[in-house]
C-alpha cells in the first residue's frame, strides 16, 4: 500500500498531482476525476459525482470498465485498429504516450496545416549532405520505351530537406502514417494511437515509390536517420525510442508469371518464400553495396542504406520499425529481415505484418497477400493494416482523410503502441518496452478462438507464448501490455532509478518462447553444421530472372548485373558464422541466453503477483522487490545483494494498474529460498502470512516492516478503532531453531509509518510475528492547512477507500506529500464544484467551499 501512495503522487505515474495531465482531453481544459472521487466519498446523502466529459481516467479498480468506454468515442472508432489493440484500456489507466517522443521516417507530413497534425507535439528532423553514389530512387519505373527515368541521383549532388511535406517531392503516404501514429484527439474525425506523444517526422526525399531494394544511397539515409535518431535521443534521453519506417516498395523483376504461397499474383516481385530466396536478396545487397566479408567487424561494415538504419540506432536504445512488405510471400524483404544476417541488430528491430477484420464481429485475420513473419518471426508482430482511416494531403497540400491498406498502415499502429507502452513503463528503455510489447501480444479473437493466420505454414498451432511463422508474436495488446512483461527474453535488468517509484506486474511471466527458440536454433545449427554450410542445396544466383534495377539500356550486362556468385556466397557464409556465434553465446553458461532472468535495480519498488515460470534467476541489486511466492519463476530463489530488499506477500491491493485485491495461491507452500548478502534486507509484511523454504543471511540481519498487503478498508478499520490491530507472520520452514533467524527482530522492527506503530514483533525459532496498531494521537486532519482540507481529510480517513489506504500507509520520509495531496484535492475539488461537474452541487458547496 505504501509504495502505491508514493508513486501515485509522483511524476512516475502522473496521478494525484496538481498537473493532473492524464485527465486532459485535447482541446478542452483538464478536469480532475480525483476531486470527483473525493466528492463521492464526502456525499453521505447518497448523491453521486459524475465525470461528464468523454475520456476520464480510472482512479480505482471499480472505475476501469466505465473509463474504458469513455474513451471509445466515434473518433476512437474511426480506426478499428484501436479496438483490435485494446487501446482504450491503456487510455483508461492514464497512458496515451504523453512524455514520449516517437519518430517517423516517411514521405514528409503535412504538419501544422492538416488539422489532425497541428500543435507543438509535431516537429521535424532534417537530412543534409551529399549523395555518395549514383542510383535511382524508383528503379522499377525506368522504362526506355515509355521514356520514364524514375528518380535518379548522382554522387556529389547536395540534398537538404526536412520532414515537412514538400509539393512535387512527396506524396500523401507520410501524412497518413503520421496520423495513425499520433494524430490529434480533438473530437473530430479520428485520432492516432499515441495521441499524447510528441512526433518528429523525417523525410525520405521521395514518395512511397521509393524502392527499399539495394538502390538507395547510404549517405542520404545516414544523414536522415542519424538526425532523427539524435533528436529522439535528446527528447527521450537514455530511454531511446522508436522510428517508424512504412515507406517504400520492394524490388521488381521482369514478370515470371508466378503466384505466392496463398495464391496471389507475385510475378513481377522478387520472391522471398524460401531460405534460398531470402539469402539471394542478401547477396544481391552484398553485390551492389560491396559488402566485405573480411572486414574486422564482419559484414556489418557494409555501406547499404539498411546498414545506415542500424548505424543510426546501434549505440542508442532506439528501435527501427520496418514493414515486411505487401506481397504474398512467406518471409519479409531484406530491410525487415536484416537481423537474420546481423544478429546484433535484432534488439533494435521490429518487423510488421498486416491484420484485417474478420467476417465476424471481434474477429481478425492475417492479411495473406502481405509478407508474413517467416524467418523474421522473432522480431515480428502483426498489426491493423487494412482499410485504416487517417489524415491525407492532395498533390497541392490540401488536407483530407482516407482509408488505406498495407503494411504501411500496420507499422504506425506499432509505433503508436510503443509510444503508449513507453509512457506506461517510464523507467524502461525502448528495447525493454519492445520486449514487453512482444511478450504481451495477442492472437485471440474476442470469442477466445485463434485469429486466422496464427497457425504456422506447416499446420503447427502455436500455443500461448510461442511465436508463429506467419504472425510472429501476434497483435500488440494495450490491455495485457499494461500489466508487465509476459516473458523475459534473456536477462531483464530493470533499473527503477526514481526514488519512491512503483511498478506492478500481474501478468504470468513464462519461458515458453525461449524454449521454442532454443529448439529451432539447435535445428538450424545442425542443418548448417554450426553455420558453416547452406541448409539447402545451392544458392540462387539470379540467372533465371531479371531484376528491374534501372541500370540502363537493357544491354546483356545490365540484364545480368544482379547475378551473384562465389564472392557473394562467401559473404553469406560470413553472415551465417555471425548467426552461429550468437547462438553459441546464448548456449554459454548452461544455456543462460535461453533462460529468462530478472535483475531488479534502482531505488524504486517492483511488485510481482503473477504465476511465473521463467527459467532463470532473480536478483535484487537495489530498491525493493515484493512478490507472491508463485511469482519467482521455477528457480524458486531470490538473491538479495547489498542495498536490496525483498519480501513475500500473501495479498496485494493493486491500485497502480487497477487490478484491485490480488491474493496469492501459494503463500503457505514454503518453496522460496531467500539468500541475503551483507547489507541486504528482508521485508516482513504486517498484513501477510507467508511461509518460505529458507532464509540465509550472509552478514548482519536487517529487517523492514511493510503494510503492502493491507487494503484501504483494513487500514481504515484499525485507524478508526473498528479493529484492534493488523497482524502478519513470516515463517522459514527449513531454518532450524539454532539459526536464531529472527533473534534481533524486535530491535530492528521499528515503525517508520506515520499513522501506525509496532505493537509487537517477536521471533520464535524460524517464525516471526508482527502486530501493528494505530499510533496514539495521530490524525489525518492534522496535516491539513485549511478548514476545507480538514473536511477532506476527515472524509478520506472515514471512507476505507483505496485513497485511504494510500494515505494511511505513508512512511515518515513521505510525510510532506500528505499535506500536498490535501491541498491538491482542495484545489481540484473546488474547481470541479465551481464548474458544475458534480451532482448535488449544493451539498458539495456546503461541504467543501465554505470559507
Describe the function of each predicted region.
Residues 1-4, 8-50:
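Gram-negative bacterial Sec-dependent N-terminal signal peptides
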Residues 6-11, 427, 439-454, 458, ...:
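Outer-membrane translocation/initiation segment of Type V secreted surface proteins
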Residues 23, 107-111, 205-207, 248, ...:
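Acidic glycine-/aspartate-rich tracts in secreted/extracellular proteins
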Residues 51-67, 78, 88-220, 236-240, ...:
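Subtilisin-like serine protease catalytic core
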Residues 97-98, 164, 169-172, 184-187, ...:
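Substrate-binding/access-modulating region of protease and related hydrolase catalytic domains
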Residues 106, 126-150, 338-419, 423:
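Extracellular S/T/G-rich loop segment that most often corresponds to the catalytic His/Ser-adjacent loop
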Residues 178-181, 187, 202-208, 385-467:
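Hydrolase catalytic cores
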Residues 332-333, 593, 608-696, 711-718:
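Surface-exposed loop/turn positions within long extracellular repeat scaffolds
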